[in-house]
């Protein structure tokens, strides 16, 4: 079956669902059959499903569809486990499996792993997702999409086995940032919320009052202060990969009612999830050691910079003075990496600076629409005894 035939068959039944598409002709074909404000096009490989997942978590009463590819889902299989563990019933992931990297052009193509023994549907089931369907006809595709849109029994993953035919329908005249604005404004209008905050105040008006911070006592731990700082600055969505320096904070986030915490197996996955959460109106933060920043480079550059999406990054400074592990040596590249990546940051060496730095970082990223990093010195995250 052809991809565009699948799209044409379901386009008329899509109403207010939000759609995230992958690259090239997948995006172009969906735009050709249903050009709508609720579509975010051209999301990079390995990021489509994380974006859609984050969006579904931010808007639990709204159906979200991901049009991913076999190459894209194979790029980050760990997102399937995250979906299974969290179970958003409003999420439908469609993997358009043509067994190759085909949609990028008119020339010869390279086969993907799904052309061999890799069974994407089997991987999804083994990850813990119950509603997994592999379809080979347009009628079957229409049926499982309809069931996913009408049901609420958990997330759905559909493997649509398409051929390698493409409909060259022309490309979009929008770049990522224009598409982002259109998409977010549509969500603001239909969800009655404010997401974009380019200015903190009207001209001539005083600045918005600072958050009220609880006092810091001498025996307060770093983890406790960071958690309080997140709450007091109204951060309500946090992703993290377990890290000794952040263990106390993560434990508190897991128990908190005011914060949605999503554990991830890869920091880059978490960055993509945060992008989707922000698009849906959440105030997200990603907690990771600085080596995790390196692992997130692709997602930050290909995603957040392409679309202009802010994110508060809170990082432990591995390789800083006091480091005791040999693998921390590469940490001294952190600040040059941040500068080269054009990520604004603040280095924190005093616990009393932590809460205000979260406040200031959120303000900066709201008008800058770019990631902001709070880099916490190693002696604060892992104080030595004595």
For every predicted segment, state its role.
Residues 1-45, 222-231:
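Active-site diphosphate/adenylate-binding microenvironment
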Residues 15-18, 39, 130-131, 234-238, ...:
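Short active-site oxyanion
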Residues 90, 198-201, 206-385:
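N-terminal alpha/beta PP-like core and its mobile active-site loop of ThDP/TPP-dependent enzymes
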